């Protein structure tokens, strides 16, 4: 089942031709592997990109790859390093070592604050950067595509004390993929058949870190209407979840079209955009194209 289900995700490397617009110059900083960065229960690899010029207290962006991908592949095939050069933030590229090359977004451990597995390993990477690179703990964010988008939801759900916001490209809500039998795949969720009330979705996040009363992460969600791998209903379910976590309603504050085939809905909290959903009309699972990363960076405040 997992092998068949992953076939749609195996196509993710085709985004390489769509995402990158210009190669880094010869004088650009290089991606480096970091070892011994802290607790790492699932043996993730850590790759780090620090631009030649960073801000005095740089922000940190975790950029998580798709299934079958890797940290170096996501570095090469996306715009985030180039945008880091422009705006002076640091990018962490986690890399899965298990056979599927998919992030663990399903186990009870990864879905619980301090529970273990991939989410804890990634938090260790962040803490390492905060300590070694004088980065700003109040400006830590996550993004990713497909499996990486699902991990983005996991990180914001289980570690709201670490991540202030995220941008998830073609993912599913936090805990939608939850399993207890060791499986990496949840067909009901992937097929868009797991439907809950906003309260139920929000409760899943709140139970991941009981007693947490700090700031709620901001979330930007992207999904193609023709996604046949992680189907489009997951987009609406994720909006339900993150608006409920923020304590705001389901009615958009505003709706517009930044591009002809995009419909963007925004949900404000205290006059600022807390949740943003961008529906890509006729977009497939691999809808991501050049320029979308800039929208994500702008939403997260990394361009300021």
Regions from the language model: what does each represent?
Residues 22-60, 73, 78, 82, ...:
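A domain-start/cap signature at the N-terminus of enzymes
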Residues 221-223, 227:
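Short beta-strand/loop motif that positions the catalytic acidic residue
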Residues 150-200, 217, 230-232, 236:
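Hydrolase active-site cap/lid region
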Residues 59-68, 170, 223, 281:
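The conserved beta1-alpha1 loop
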Residues 52-57, 105-150, 157-163, 214:
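Gly/Ser-rich "nucleophile elbow"/oxyanion-hole loop immediately N-terminal to the catalytic nucleophile
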Residues 1-28:
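Secretory targeting and sorting signals
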Residues 142-144, 169, 222:
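Short beta-strand immediately N-terminal to the catalytic nucleophile in serine-hydrolase-like folds
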Residues 54-101, 176, 286:
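Short substrate-entry loop that stabilizes the transition state in hydrolases
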């Amino acid at each position: 089942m997992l092998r068949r289900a992953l076939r749609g995700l195996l196509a993710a490397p085709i985004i390489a031709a769509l995402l990158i617009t210009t190669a880094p110059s010869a004088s650009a900083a290089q991606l480096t592997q970091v070892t011994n960065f802290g607790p790492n229960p699932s043996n993730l690899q850590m790759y780090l990109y620090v631009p030649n010029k960073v801000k005095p207290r740089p922000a940190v962006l975790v950029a998580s790859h798709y299934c079958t991908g890797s940290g170096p592949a996501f570095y090469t095939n996306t715009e985030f390093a180039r945008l880091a050069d422009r705006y002076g933030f640091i990018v962490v590229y986690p890399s899965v070592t298990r056979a599927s090359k998919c992030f663990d977004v399903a186990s009870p451990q990864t879905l619980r604050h301090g529970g273990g597995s991939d989410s804890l390993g990634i938090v260790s990477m962040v803490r390492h950067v905060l300590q070694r690179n004088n980065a700003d703990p109040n400006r830590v964010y996550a993004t990713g595509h497909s499996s990486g988008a699902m991990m983005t939801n996991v990180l914001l759900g289980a570690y709201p004390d670490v991540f202030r916001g995220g941008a998830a490209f073609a993912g599913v809500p936090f805990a939608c993929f939850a399993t207890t039998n060791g499986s990496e795949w949840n067909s009901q969720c992937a097929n868009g058949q797991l439907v809950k009330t906003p309260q139920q979705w929000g409760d899943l996040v709140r139970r991941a870190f009981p007693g947490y009363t700090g700031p709620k992460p901001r979330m930007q969600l992207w999904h193609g209407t023709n996604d046949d791998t992680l189907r489009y209903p997951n987009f609406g379910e994720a909006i339900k979840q993150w608006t409920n976590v923020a304590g705001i309603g389901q009615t958009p504050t505003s709706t517009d079209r930044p591009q002809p085939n995009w419909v963007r809905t925004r949900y404000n909290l205290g006059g600022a955009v807390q949740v943003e959903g961008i529906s890509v009309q006729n977009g497939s699972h691999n809808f991501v194209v050049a320029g979308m990363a800039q929208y994500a960076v702008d939403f997260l405040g990394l361009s300021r």
